[in-house]
Amino acid sequence: MSLAEIADVRLEGGGVMFQYLLLQLEWDAERRTIVRGLNYQPYVDKIEEQIVESAREELGENGFFEKGGDLQIGGGGSVAFNLYYENITLFGSNPTYGVEEDRDAVAKMIESAYPEHEVSWYGPEPLDSSSEPSDSNSKE
C-alpha cells in the first residue's frame, strides 16, 4: 500500500453542510494530507470523533495502522456544498481542533476533487468587539 492510493478528499453523508478535518498521514517515511468530512447537523454530538473514526476505519481496511502508519489531526472547519449552484465554500474553524494552517491548500484539494464546482473560502475572523449589540432599551 502507498499513501498515494488514498483519496485526497472524501465528504460523506450527502447534504449541504459538512464539518471537515484535515488529517496528516505518515507511513514508511511518506507523508500525505487528506480531508475528511461528514454531513453536519446541529443536533449531532461529537461529529469530530465520527470523522476520525470513519477515517481510521478507511485506513485500517488497507492495513495502514498495522504497518506502522500514524494519523494526526491538523484542524478543520465547515463546508457549505451547494449542488444546485455548483459551488463549495469553506469557512469557520473546528471547535475541537481549531483551524487548519493553510486553508488555501485545502480549497485546492477540494477543487481537484470536485472540478465542476467553484470553490471559495474565508478564514475564521475574530469577533469584532465593536460589533456587539448595543443595549437599545437603556434609559439615560
Predicted regions and their residues:
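Intrinsic low-complexity, intrinsically disordered or marginally ordered coil/linker segments
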Residues: 1-140
